[in-house]
Amino acid sequence: MDGRSILDENLKTVERAIIDIKAQSKAPSTIVAYGCDLRRLARILGEINLTFQDLDKHNLVGLLNAVKVNEAGRTLSSGRINGLFSSLNALMKYLEYTDEIEYNAIPMFRERYLTSYKRKQSTGIPRQCPTNEQVKSVIDGSPMIRDQAIHMVLAKTGLRNKELRALDVSDVDLVEKCIIAKHTTKRDGLKLPIDDECTVYLDRWLWDRRTFSGANEEGALFLNDRGSRLGRNTLLRIINRDGGRQGLHDPDSDIRQLDRRYTPHVYRHWMTTTLRESGCSERVIRYIRGDAEGSSADRYDHLRWETVQREYLAAMPLLIPRP
């Protein structure tokens, strides 16, 4: 087959694999990510005249070398490369299950090459963790009450980008001072405490939110300018923009230069560090972060909400003192 025919064959294989992955009830975001990765791999394999069915332990090293640099000429991070091969593993499992290949060589390959590759390629650069004063300056410098509330909620809860965007108005209780986060594969703890300061910013936003188009019909807590649920890239742009205004985000930095990038995940580091330095117990911190229990005994020793709220409020600092 020529290159075009190989590409067409690879893309058909991808579509069949995606149908199978959907049947496994994978998360929608996982399905989208797998689809993007596999279509990219389909093109790369087409360029080197290989179908997915041709892949074995002898030619996977060549594929690894081919994917290290993206279309923009940037060298991919070890995490990104591992992500590509994780997607490829899902497709190869499908081909093995349907007897289109004799065996799936990806697990053996990843153990031999990607573990050491990740260790060698790690940048060793810690993600940026702002000071209290820097977080305050970002919030103060944000131009809209919506964006100020976003920064405040991220800082006070440590929610991830996706988790914050999934929040609905009904998930916020300003009386009990808590937020109910949606259950995800990465989050166990659902009921999260917030302090008076975060409550004030949310109250201001909920008042201002009424003026947004579609506010009555859309249940999402944070809306975009069209009145729909805030998107991933829009949220990232807000955080990047406001961090950049305070000199905390370099838009020209490489994605691996974590110390020069101000992203939603920065707040997760800030919250964890702040609570720990203020004496909050590790178990409460794990609960707020949504981490799994530390031991099997933790499943029987129930962590009471009153304990979570008390320790959290004692450890969480006031960022913007009232005049």
Predicted regions and their residues:
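Catalytic-site neighborhood detector that most strongly recognizes the C-terminal catalytic loop/helix
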Residues: H183, R289-A315
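C-terminal secondary-structure termini that scaffold catalytic or DNA-interacting sites
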Residues: M1-R4, A314-P323
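N-terminal core-binding DNA-recognition domain of tyrosine recombinases/integrases
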Residues: E15-S29, G35-K120
